[in-house]
């Protein structure tokens, strides 16, 4: 289910505060966050946000087409290493 339109999009308060400070000073710097559930809103466009993927922070540049998506969608947490092999060499 999608979020109700009566509610505002979720954005972590600490993340919103950091972005508003940078916008007021007209500065661009990397913002580090663990908040993967935060929704990207229009005031974030043009900033670089380092999103935690469980191991490290991946820097993501926010563009206009990302608005409305969650931050966690752009920092994959799993790496697929391939299916198990069936030959006899891999069993040894």
UniProtKB/Swiss-Prot annotation:
Disulfide bonding pattern of the chain: none
The organism's place on the tree of life at top rank: Eukaryota
A Gene Ontology biological process term: ribosomal small subunit assembly
Record Gene3D superfamilies: 30s Ribosomal Protein S19, Chain A
Pfam families for the chain: Ribosomal_S19
PROSITE patterns linked to this entry: RIBOSOMAL_S19 (PS00323)
Classification via SUPFAM superfamilies: Ribosomal protein S19 (SSF54570)
Keyword annotations of the record: Chloroplast, Plastid, Ribonucleoprotein, Ribosomal protein, RNA-binding, rRNA-binding
GN (gene name): rps19
Protein family (similarity comment): Belongs to the universal ribosomal protein uS19 family.
Organism of this sequence: Nandina domestica
GO molecular function: rRNA binding; structural constituent of ribosome
Function: Protein S19 forms a complex with S13 that binds strongly to the 16S ribosomal RNA.
Compartments, as annotated in UniProt: Plastid, Chloroplast
InterPro entries to which the protein is assigned, alphabetical: Ribosomal_uS19, Ribosomal_uS19_bac-type, Ribosomal_uS19_CS, Ribosomal_uS19_SF
NCBIfam families given in the database record: rpsS_bact
Protein name according to UniProt: Small ribosomal subunit protein uS19c
GO CC aspect terms: chloroplast; mitochondrial small ribosomal subunit
